Protein backbone atom coordinates (compact mmCIF):
# COMPACT_ATOMS: atom_id res chain seq x y z
CA UNK A 1 0.00 0.00 0.00
CA UNK A 2 1.25 3.46 -0.91
CA UNK A 3 1.99 5.86 1.94
CA UNK A 4 0.14 9.12 1.19
CA UNK A 5 1.51 11.06 4.17
CA UNK A 6 3.71 14.06 3.47
CA UNK A 7 7.36 13.15 3.80
CA UNK A 8 8.12 16.09 6.13
CA UNK A 9 5.80 18.25 8.20
CA UNK A 10 6.09 20.89 10.92
CA UNK A 11 4.45 20.01 14.22
CA UNK A 12 2.62 22.75 16.07
CA UNK A 13 3.30 22.93 19.81
CA UNK A 14 -0.10 21.34 20.48
CA UNK A 15 0.98 18.23 18.55
CA UNK A 16 4.34 18.02 20.31
CA UNK A 17 2.65 18.21 23.71
CA UNK A 18 0.24 15.40 22.76
CA UNK A 19 2.70 13.40 20.64
CA UNK A 20 2.28 10.17 22.63
CA UNK A 21 -1.53 10.32 22.22
CA UNK A 22 -1.53 10.74 18.44
CA UNK A 23 -1.56 7.78 16.05
CA UNK A 24 1.80 7.70 14.29
CA UNK A 25 0.18 7.15 10.88
CA UNK A 26 -1.52 10.57 11.19
CA UNK A 27 1.86 12.31 11.29
CA UNK A 28 4.40 12.89 8.52
CA UNK A 29 7.20 10.41 7.98
CA UNK A 30 9.78 12.98 9.10
CA UNK A 31 8.93 15.30 11.98
CA UNK A 32 10.06 18.92 12.15
CA UNK A 33 9.51 21.66 14.73
CA UNK A 34 10.02 25.39 14.69
CA UNK A 35 12.44 27.16 17.01
CA UNK A 36 9.30 28.95 18.25
CA UNK A 37 7.86 25.61 19.42
CA UNK A 38 11.13 24.92 21.22
CA UNK A 39 10.79 28.31 22.96
CA UNK A 40 7.24 27.47 24.05
CA UNK A 41 8.39 24.09 25.34
CA UNK A 42 11.29 25.73 27.21
CA UNK A 43 8.84 28.10 28.90
CA UNK A 44 6.48 25.27 29.84
CA UNK A 45 8.22 23.99 33.00
CA UNK A 46 8.29 27.54 34.36
CA UNK A 47 4.57 28.06 33.77
CA UNK A 48 3.35 25.65 36.45
CA UNK A 49 3.73 25.40 40.20
CA UNK A 50 2.90 21.69 40.22
CA UNK A 51 6.13 19.72 40.73
CA UNK A 52 5.00 16.62 38.81
CA UNK A 53 3.72 18.67 35.89
CA UNK A 54 6.95 20.67 35.83
CA UNK A 55 8.96 17.44 35.68
CA UNK A 56 6.74 16.07 32.88
CA UNK A 57 7.18 19.26 30.85
CA UNK A 58 10.95 19.27 31.41
CA UNK A 59 11.14 15.64 30.29
CA UNK A 60 9.19 16.43 27.10
CA UNK A 61 11.48 19.38 26.35
CA UNK A 62 14.60 17.26 26.80
CA UNK A 63 13.24 14.43 24.62
CA UNK A 64 12.37 16.84 21.81
CA UNK A 65 15.73 18.63 22.10
CA UNK A 66 17.51 15.28 21.84
CA UNK A 67 15.55 14.06 18.83
CA UNK A 68 14.86 17.10 16.61
CA UNK A 69 16.86 20.05 15.32
CA UNK A 70 14.42 22.97 15.14
CA UNK A 71 13.84 24.91 11.95
CA UNK A 72 15.04 28.48 12.52
CA UNK A 73 12.84 31.55 12.50
CA UNK A 74 14.96 33.30 9.90
CA UNK A 75 14.51 36.10 7.36
CA UNK A 76 12.32 33.95 5.11
CA UNK A 77 10.13 33.00 8.06
CA UNK A 78 9.91 36.67 9.08
CA UNK A 79 8.69 37.57 5.58
CA UNK A 80 6.17 34.72 5.70
CA UNK A 81 5.00 35.99 9.10
CA UNK A 82 4.33 39.39 7.55
CA UNK A 83 2.20 37.75 4.87
CA UNK A 84 0.23 35.73 7.43
CA UNK A 85 -0.16 38.75 9.70
CA UNK A 86 -1.54 40.76 6.77
CA UNK A 87 -4.04 38.01 6.00
CA UNK A 88 -5.28 37.99 9.58
CA UNK A 89 -5.34 41.79 9.72
CA UNK A 90 -7.56 41.89 6.62
CA UNK A 91 -9.95 39.56 8.43
CA UNK A 92 -9.91 41.88 11.47
CA UNK A 93 -8.00 39.45 13.66
CA UNK A 94 -5.15 40.56 15.90
CA UNK A 95 -1.99 38.48 16.08
CA UNK A 96 -0.67 39.22 19.55
CA UNK A 97 0.67 37.10 22.40
CA UNK A 98 0.12 33.36 21.92
CA UNK A 99 -1.62 34.07 18.61
CA UNK A 100 1.54 35.71 17.29
CA UNK A 101 3.52 32.61 18.31
CA UNK A 102 1.07 30.42 16.37
CA UNK A 103 1.60 32.60 13.30
CA UNK A 104 5.38 32.43 13.72
CA UNK A 105 5.20 28.63 13.78
CA UNK A 106 2.97 28.66 10.69
CA UNK A 107 5.37 31.12 9.03
CA UNK A 108 8.24 28.72 9.67
CA UNK A 109 6.28 25.95 7.94
CA UNK A 110 5.38 28.26 5.05
CA UNK A 111 8.96 29.45 4.57
CA UNK A 112 10.09 25.82 4.27
CA UNK A 113 7.10 24.93 2.05
CA UNK A 114 5.92 22.32 4.54
CA UNK A 115 2.48 21.49 5.94
CA UNK A 116 1.66 22.38 9.54
CA UNK A 117 0.22 19.66 11.77
CA UNK A 118 -1.97 20.90 14.63
CA UNK A 119 -4.47 19.78 17.25
CA UNK A 120 -6.13 23.20 16.92
CA UNK A 121 -7.05 23.66 13.24
CA UNK A 122 -9.63 26.32 14.15
CA UNK A 123 -6.74 28.57 15.18
CA UNK A 124 -5.45 28.56 11.59
CA UNK A 125 -8.65 28.97 9.54
CA UNK A 126 -7.76 32.55 8.57
CA UNK A 127 -4.49 31.44 6.95
CA UNK A 128 -5.47 27.99 5.66
CA UNK A 129 -5.42 29.17 2.04
CA UNK A 130 -1.79 30.20 2.46
CA UNK A 131 -0.38 27.42 4.66
CA UNK A 132 -1.39 23.77 4.37
CA UNK A 133 -2.96 22.92 7.72
CA UNK A 134 -3.38 19.27 8.71
CA UNK A 135 -5.55 18.50 11.73
CA UNK A 136 -4.57 15.54 13.90
Language-model features, listed with the residues they occupy:
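Short, hinge-like loop/turn segments at secondary-structure boundaries
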Residues: 49-52, 89, 134-136
Amino acid sequence: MLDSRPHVGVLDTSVVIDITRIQRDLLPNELAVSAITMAELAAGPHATLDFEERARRQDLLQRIEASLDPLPFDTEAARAFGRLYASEFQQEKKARGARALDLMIAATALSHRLPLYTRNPQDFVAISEIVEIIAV
